[in-house]
């Protein structure tokens, strides 16, 4: 029962890497970010405002976390999200963290979301600070402590294909050793 958790900073490539890992391993992908965005849209609240709302309403995070934990317990899943690894570490075979400089992530986000670089950079910095405070107060998790991760990958100067290849090489090697069979 394989469980892989992929976490990382906004714009680091975590969603794209997680999607490809899930495809290659033929596992479902569960994304806490998309669940969070869905909840924001359903409530008709701007994404950043929803982060602020969630900071005051921990039930939002708890709902998403409970869903992630249940999927991890069931096994055979790739979980993706900012806190995925911290939340499901007891059930995960492998935890990967992707990071990149704030400027590079802002550039990626500005292209992805069709917004100015300046707006994306402001949003990245604001979102990170909101997340840092919320996770520290709600979970007592310091998102700068990466000790729960098996692999920390700086994607600043990697193409997305390089980030995927490195992640899959690591995953396939570890799972092959752990389960004594070929995974990829």
From Swiss-Prot:
Pfam families: AAA_17. It is found in: Cytoplasm. Its EC number is 2.7.4.25. GO terms for molecular function: ATP binding; CMP kinase activity; dCMP kinase activity. It comes from the Archaea. GO terms for cellular component: cytoplasm. It catalyses: CMP + ATP = CDP + ADP; dCMP + ATP = dCDP + ADP. GO terms for biological process: pyrimidine nucleotide metabolic process. Its main location: cytoplasm. ATP binds at residues 8-16. Keywords: ATP-binding, Cytoplasm, Kinase, Nucleotide-binding, Transferase. It is an enzyme of class 2 (transferase). Belongs to the cytidylate kinase family. Type 2 subfamily. This is Cytidylate kinase. It comes from Pyrobaculum islandicum (strain DSM 4184 / JCM 9189 / GEO3). The lineage of its organism: Archaea, Thermoproteota, Thermoprotei, Thermoproteales, Thermoproteaceae.
